[in-house]
Amino acid sequence: MSLRSLRALCLTSFFIADVRDGLGPFLGIFLTQRHWQAEDIGLLMTVGGVAGLLATLPAGFITDTSRHKRVLLAGVCLAITLTTLLLWFSQKTSVVALSQVASGICAAFVGPLIAGITLGLTRQRGFSAQMGKNEAFNHAGNFFTALIAGAIAWYWGIGGIFILMACTTLLTLVALLAIRGGDIDDDAARGIEAASTPSLPGFAILFRHTPLLIAGVTLMLFH
């Protein structure tokens, strides 16, 4: 595995923390300043969350079959940012609903894509350790960008959050480009370690393997 690609993956996890959730908690503040009612804000945020939940399963399938995970991750990051920036120009109900649904669907791809890229770089033997590093960088990214966002909102207003998100998106794309495509083993990213690996089980294994089904239901309820 390439040390450069692994470091770039950590930086990707750091910067993507601010991109993944769009405006995050600042969305409610932004819409309240535009004279939205709390119940309307809550409804549309719920719609976006439900859209993201429904997209989780197909996002996993698409990630598993894709051989262009970096490009796909760059695409969903750009889509989240662009649909969020729409809110600055229009706060119509239809525009906000479109933004939240699109952002929710795109955000569902981020976790599986990061996991797939990680597995493709480290194979199974190094996956757990690298995922731990990814999460550490991701939480650090959440912490620092929240501090910066709070300072920006305090001094320059909520509009500065849009600029911050655009900047972190650009930094995410730069970090993604630093991951060498040739370092990602697409077969390993799907759990295939060698040519002798038996064919991967299908979706039906969930219903034949009780512990796996319980784990899946638990994760679904968690979300």
Spans of model-derived segments:
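Central cavity-lining transmembrane alpha-helices of secondary-active solute carriers
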Residues: 43-61
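Structural signature of the two symmetry-related core transmembrane helices
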Residues: 71-85
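Cytoplasmic helix-loop-helix junction between adjacent transmembrane helices
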Residues: 101-138
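Helix-loop boundary and gating motifs at the non-cytosolic
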Residues: 2-49, 213-218, 223
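C-terminal membrane-cytosol helix-exit motif in multi-pass small-molecule transporters
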Residues: 167-189
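Juxtamembrane intracellular "pre-TM" segments in multi-pass secondary transporters
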Residues: 1-3, 181-216
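Helix-to-loop junctions at the C-terminal end of transmembrane segments
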Residues: 55-68, 153
